[in-house]
Curated annotation (Swiss-Prot):
Role summary: Catalyzes the NADPH-dependent reduction of N-acetyl-5-glutamyl phosphate to yield N-acetyl-L-glutamate 5-semialdehyde.
Protein name: N-acetyl-gamma-glutamyl-phosphate reductase
Subcellular locations according to the entry: Cytoplasm
Any Pfam family hit: Semialdhyde_dh
Gene, per the UniProt record: argC
Origin organism lineage: Bacteria, Pseudomonadati, Pseudomonadota, Gammaproteobacteria, Alteromonadales
Family: Belongs to the NAGSA dehydrogenase family. Type 1 subfamily.
Record-annotated active site: 155
UniProt source species: Shewanella oneidensis (strain ATCC 700550 / JCM 31522 / CIP 106686 / LMG 19005 / NCIMB 14063 / MR-1)
Length: 326
C-alpha cells in the first residue's frame, strides 16, 4: 500500500485525482491539502463536490506541521498547484526523499532559459530540474519508473503528442498544424468572467504564443503551429492535426507507425474514423482517428481526451502506478 498526499485538492484536477486514488486498492490518501490562506481549508471535499460524497476527507491547510507529517507518512506527493507554487514545493519534497508528481508546468522544460519567457519566473532549482522526467505515460514509462521527480504533461500536449509521436520518422520539415478545442474546466475553478459558461463562445486564444506550443515542440523534437480554442462545453479536448509526410510514404506505413499503440490499453486508434469528445469524457482514454492522402502526402489525425483525466489526473495516476510498479 502506497500513501499519497494530494496538494491543491480543491481544484478540478486535484478533486478528480482524489477520486481516482481513493478508488485504487493499492493506494491510500495520506491527506488532502490546500494553501494556508485558502477559503476552502477545513471544509469537506464533499461540500465542494457532492458527487464525491463517498470520500469522507477534509481539506487541510498546508502548514509546516502538515508538510512534516507528509514527509513522515507519505510515499509520494501530487502537486495540483500553480506553477510558481509547485516550483518550490516540488523541490522541497524531492529533497526529503518523496516521489513527486507535479501537474504544473514548473518542471516540464529541461532548459532553464524557457521559464522566464513562458512561465514568468527564473527556475531556482536546476539540480532538481535535471532529475525531472516528462511523464507522457505511454512513451516514458521506463524513465518514470526510475526517477522520483515526474512532470506530468499538460492537457493539450498530451492530446497532441499522443497523436504525433508515432509519426516522428515520417514527418517532413514542414510544421505540423495543431488546432485544439478544450472545455472550460481547462481554465480552472477560479471564477473569471471570460470562462463563465454564459460568456463562453468558441474562440481561439493564445495564438502563436501559448506555453504549450514549446512544450509540444520540445517533446516532439520539431517545431509546430499550435492554436488552442475555448469551447462551450465543460470538459474534454479535441485536437485536429494536419501534417505533411515524407514523399513515398504509404497508408500502410502510417498504419505501421500507429501500431505502436497495439499494446497500449488506454489508446484506441482507428483509420478513416474520427473521435468525438463525448466518447472519452470521464475516462482515462485517448481516441485517435486518422486519414492519409497518398497523392498529396498530407495526413489528418484527430485526438480526443478528457482534459481533467488523461490530460491531468488519470495520467498522474498512470505515472504513480508505473513508478511504484502497481
Amino acid at each position: 500500500m502506497k500513501n499519497i498526499a494530494i496538494i491543491g485538492a480543491s481544484g478540478y484536477t486535484g478533486a478528480q485525482l482524489t477520486a481516482l486514488v481513493h478508488a485504487e486498492s493499492e493506494l491510500s490518501i495520506q491527506g488532502l491539502y490546500v494553501s494556508e490562506n485558502s477559503l476552502d481549508k477545513g471544509r469537506a471535499l464533499a461540500d465542494l463536490y457532492p458527487v464525491y460524497s463517498h470520500i469522507e476527507l477534509t481539506l487541510s491547510p498546508l502548514t509546516e506541521e502538515a508538510k512534516a507529517n507528509i514527509v513522515a507518512e507519505a510515499d509520494a506527493v501530487v502537486l495540483a498547484t500553480e506553477h510558481s507554487v509547485s516550483l518550490h514545493l516540488a523541490a522541497w519534497f524531492y529533497s526529503q526523499g518523496l516521489a513527486v508528481f507535479d501537474l504544473s508546468g514548473a518542471y516540464r522544460f529541461s532548459d532553464v532559459a524557457q521559464y522566464p519567457k513562458w512561465y514568468g519566473f527564473e527556475h531556482e532549482y536546476p539540480e532538481v530540474l535535471a532529475k525531472a522526467v516528462y511523464g507522457l505515460a505511454e512513451w516514458n514509462a521506463k524513465d518514470v519508473a526510475a526517477t522520483k521527480m515526474i512532470a506530468v504533461p499538460g492537457c493539450y500536449p498530451t492530446a497532441s503528442l499522443t497523436a504525433l509521436k508515432p509519426l516522428k520518422n515520417l514527418l517532413t520539415s514542414a510544421y505540423p498544424v495543431i488546432n485544439a478545442v478544450s472545455g472550460v474546466t481547462g481554465a480552472g475553478r477560479k471564477a473569471q468572467l471570460h470562462t463563465s459558461f454564459c460568456e463562453v463562445s468558441l474562440t481561439p486564444y493564445g495564438v502563436l504564443g501559448h506555453r504549450h506550443q514549446p512544450e509540444i515542440a520540445t517533446q516532439l523534437g520539431q517545431e509546430v503551429i499550435f492554436t488552442p480554442h475555448l469551447g462551450n462545453f465543460k470538459r474534454g479536448i479535441l485536437a485536429t492535426i494536419t501534417v505533411q509526410l515524407k514523399p513515398g510514404t504509404t497508408t500502410a506505413d502510417v498504419a505501421a507507425a500507429y501500431s505502436v499503440y497495439d499494446q497500449a490499453p488506454l489508446v484506441t486508434v482507428k483509420q478513416n474514423q474520427f473521435p468525438k469528445v463525448d466518447d472519452v469524457v470521464l475516462t482515462p482514454n485517448c481516441h485517435l482517428g486518422w486519414k492519409f492522402d497518398e497523392s498529396s502526402g498530407y495526413l489528418v489525425v484527430a485526438s480526443a481526451i478528457d482534459n481533467l483525466m488523461k490530460g491531468a489526473a488519470s495520467q498522474a495516476l498512470q505515472c504513480i502506478k508505473i513508478h511504484f510498479n502497481l
